[in-house]
Structure formats: structure tokens, C-alpha cells
Amino acid sequence: MTILLNTIFILFIGIWFVRFFVEMDVPEKYRVSRFFQNTTDYKGEGLTKKDVLRILFLAFLIRVLIYFASVLIYLVQSDFLSHAAAFSWNDFFNLWNKSDAQHYLAEKGYVNCTEVTEWSGREEHLFLVFFPLYPWFIRFFHFFVNSYAVAAFAVSIISFCVGCVFFYGAVKEEYGASIAEKSLTLLLLYPFSFFFGGIMTESLFFCLISAGFFYIRRHKWLIVGLIGLLASLCRIQGVILLGVGIVEFLISSQLIRMIQEGQFKGFLKYFFTEAVWLFLIPIGNLVYLGLNYQITGNAFQFTVYQKNHWYHTTTWFTNCVAEIMRYISGQVSDTTLLIWYPELILFVVAAALLLYSLRTQPLKYSAYLLVYTLINYSVTFLISGGRYMLNAIPLFFFTAALLNKHKLLYQLLCFASALLYGICFTAFLTGGAIY
């Protein structure tokens, strides 16, 4: 299995780069084969004000309905009559105060947020593993509301609603309205998308990545750089926008043609006046490393905590997949059904869609999906893969494009996703193995 996966990976990388050079306008006589040329020609459509208002309303309505559903599920699985009258905001908060939601740093900050650990025997700044942007946003909103919990929900709700607009806009301008509608529907029905409403980074990161894609499509490089900087302050994967932006810049500027025509100096001028803004993006990661260094004296202290407290060490993706398969082959439990099977299925789906994308999808999106998936599947003891892959957003682009002319298959997928959503959401609210 390891040899097969590595072989497929190497072949994919090789074919991807050949197509990349072809799309930078390699002269016809140098092209290896028509196989490496894009076989699709999607007709994008502009995002309208009506689209913006409609998607904002839809996203907000969905968040309200999901929160209402969470209360109903809580009341149904408990003694409905004895709990309904006494149900309070604190009860609602506790429904969503699970997994990483309990660890955010808005109130205490990194310095004052410590725990005594068994492996060191002293207080450690364990929560340095969490990036700072989401807590900073919560702290900002706390100026306007009295509760950190309310501030956190406000950040998540606003980020989700705005993110849906950028998501829809990016897909519509690239693929057209039909695929945009299907992509958004698949995203909303993704079995782990309820995490968008929690006190976690999912919604904020989703908003920033979607906005990054939207402005990369429009070649607004300064805006992309600023958004990417925020994204890399939100999660380490935010830095991927740098690669996505460079891919789009090099393809759109037709680098090889410019070299062939003796316009390399013109390209350099264009690069250093426009694309140079993309290099703002890694600053977010550097700020995070600086926080680690300032607090502990080690810029990579978060990796120590990940290893010793959360049992995460960096590994090659094939080792992660092999570990998941070993867990699946063991005794069946809720962990097997809610963590390991979904993670294996998601990996297979992502790999299949990447292969499908080689000749059919924009390279910037396949580059993001490949690197994002590799990062997520390059750790040991991956227990939150379903949640992490929520922001592998080209998954939804590619699936919608693939099923755009297959109405029955699309409807079956929507039905299956909705069913699994209900199962996973209920498990999350009732203490199941959903992280």
C-alpha cells in the first residue's frame, strides 16, 4: 500500500508540473502531449449584489436552524419536560463547549493559560498549539458584548456568513452559477460542517481561505497578501495561499511566453510591483513562531506540546493512512465509526478528486487540495481529520463539477451527506467521539 500511494503521488506531481508549464504558454512544438492540456472550459459568471444578500441570509438562517436543532436534540435525549423550562444560555453554551472549544485563550491569553502536565511535572503553556487570530477576534468582539462566549459565537457566525459569500463568489466566477449552487450545498451538508457554528477556528479560517480564493481569481494581489497573512495567523495551513497565489500569477502572466518573446524584464517588473505582496502571507506563521519563542524560549515549542500531550508527531502521509487502517482493523467502537472510517473515506475521496482534477480543474485549486490534505494527513493519531477536511474547500468545487450533469448521483450524495450530518451532529452533542 505504501509503495502504491508513493508511486501515485510521484506520478501526480510529475503530471501536475507538466500541465503547469503547458499553462504558462509553452510553445506548441515543445508540448509533450495533448494529455497534459486542460480539457474543460468553464464559463464563470459575475457575483451580484442579489447573490451576496441571498447567501448572507441563507447562511445566517442555517446557523440559527442548526443552533435550534442542537437545543432540540439536547432536550429530546434528556427528560424534555423537566429541562425545557429551565434551559438557559449556559446550557446552550455547554452544548457547544466541546473538544478544542474549551481551550481558547481570549480571556486569559497565552501567558496566563497553563496546566500542570504529567509528562513534565510542572505548569506548561499547552495552549500555544492554538494560533492567535481567533482568540484575538473574540477579545475584540468582547469590547461590544459582556460575554466571551457570546463574542466567540459572534465571530463564528459572522465569519461563516461572510465566508459563504466569498465561497459562492469564488466558485461562481470560476465555474458558473450551477456549480456554485451545488458546491455550497455540498459544503453545508458535509457531515462535519456543524463545526462552523462552534467556538473553534473553522469558520474564521473558512472565511479567510474563501476570500483568498476569491481575490486570487481577481488578481488583487495586495488584498490576497493581507488576507493570507491573517489566514496564516489563524492556522498553519493558511500559508498555502502563498503557493496558490504564485501558481495563478505565473499562469496568468504567461511566464514562458514572456521569456520566449524577450520580455523577462517586464515580467520581473510586474512581479515586484504586484506578486511581491503575496510574500506578506508567511508573516502570520512567523508571528506565531515568535509568540512561542517569547513565551517559552523555543519557537517550535508547540511541536513539543503536540507530541507529549496530544500524541501528534509529524510523519509521512502514508504512515498516517496505515495507522488509520490499523485502527479500523481493530475492535469496532464509536471511535472506529466516527473517526477512523470517515478519515479513510475522506482521504480516498480527496485522492480520487485530485486525480480527476489533473486534466479538468484549475491548477491553483488542485495545488491547494493536495498540500492541504498532505498537511492534515502527515501527523500521527489524527483524531480530527473530519473537521480539518472541512476547509479542504476544493473538494466541494471538484465534486460539484464532476456531478453537475449527473442529477441523480448528486441528489443521492446530498441525501447521504444529510443523513451522516445528522448522525455526526447528534454524536457531537451527546458526547460521542467527534473532535
Residues covered by each model-derived region:
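Membrane-lumen/periplasm interface segments of specific transmembrane helices
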Residues: 62-79, 238, 242-357, 364-369
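Short hydrophobic/aromatic helix or loop-helix immediately within or flanking a transmembrane segment
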Residues: 98-146, 319-325, 376
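Transmembrane-helix motifs of polytopic, lipid-linked glycan transferases
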Residues: 136-140, 154-174, 349-353
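Transmembrane-helix signature of polytopic, membrane-embedded enzymes
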Residues: 147-151, 162, 167-189, 207, ...
